[in-house]
Amino acid sequence: MNPQESAQGTWEQESPRTALDVVYIEWHVHPFRAERWFEIWEPGAARAMAFGAKGWSLTRNVEDPLHFRQASVWEIRDDFERYWYSDEVSALREEAVNYYNKPLLPVWHVLIAGE
């Protein structure tokens, strides 16, 4: 990257074949339902590994304890689609449907730095 590109905030992306993708899902849980939602959903989030995820996490917002963020890292986006729409994960979402606000919109990021 030349200095002019750096000053403009542009950067060169890795080839799509070597870059990892991170998908975030923002869960907004109904009051008094967070613990039950977590009991239902945590096994579903963990199932991402069985579908090819390189890692996953669930975090809870300190300032808004009803806001959870699910993150998972993927080499192949289609693997996330297989995970998200699998019978098992779909059933868990259905079981938890009364505990969170809809819709859920996965948002993709490209991992550009990290360990």
Segments from the language model and where they lie:
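Short amphipathic alpha-helical segments
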Residues: 33-55, 88-92
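A general secondary-structure boundary signal
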Residues: 24-28, 34, 109
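A beta-strand edge to alpha-helix "cap/lid" segment located at domain peripheries
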Residues: 38, 46, 82-84, 102, ...
